[in-house]
Amino acid sequence: EHGTAEIIKINGQDVSQMTFSNFANNPGDKSGGHLAVKRDDVVTIKLIPDYGYQLSGASINGVTLAPQAEVSTFTFTMPDTNVHFKGIFTQTSDEINTSATKVSSASFENGANAAPSGNLRLTVADSNEDTTNALAQVENAVSAEAVNLTLDQIVSKGDGTNWENPVTQLDQPVKMKLQVADYDTAAGYEVVREHNGNLTKLTTSVSEDGTLTFETNQFSTYFIV
């Protein structure tokens, strides 16, 4: 529940390229699986949590699982007995770290658009990027502050360590909310994004408490103008 357990390789060979008996030929899906494997074969499995969940443990008859370089991937050596394995997935929260002087708090919605599994870590930090070009994107701009928005996918290995991968480009956007520190009710605010040298003024709404809301599918440098 809340994830998938599947066998993907045996002795390095993809199971989709192998032939099995009708008795045991399902390497795994959402409903489970049943596969015939020889003793001493090296079995590669995936224990994939849904978004918002992490692998908190794995039940596999006492066999040791070895995390691999690829996310959510483990190996074990087949013992001389039947093995039953499953992932134990626990609901967990995304992580948000805000240290930027201009931003007092941050949040996001639709995180599954950025990470198909595990959780996200959003880091909001000050940037020393020049604001001149960003100011030129906004009519009647007076000042701007640069912040870096960094997004990482975090997937637990089940042993207290994680796979961590940066997320910079999304197919579908997430909704960002940044609360402006020392919000000036008399001023207007816009958000300009700089990604790979391209500047884009984003459609931004401003709430009464100074929270800027906008959608984005790229994570790099942002300017609060």
Language-model region placement:
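Short structured motifs
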Residues: 29-32, 71-73, 159-164
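Extracellular modular ligand-binding repeats in secreted and cell-surface proteins
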Residues: 3-54, 78-81, 168-182, 218-219
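Conserved "repeat-terminator" motif of extracellular CCP/Sushi domains
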Residues: 1, 68-94, 216-225
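Surface-exposed interfaces of beta-sheet-rich extracellular modules
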Residues: 41-72, 183-197
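Feature for mature exported/ectodomain regions
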Residues: 3-10, 90-188, 195, 225
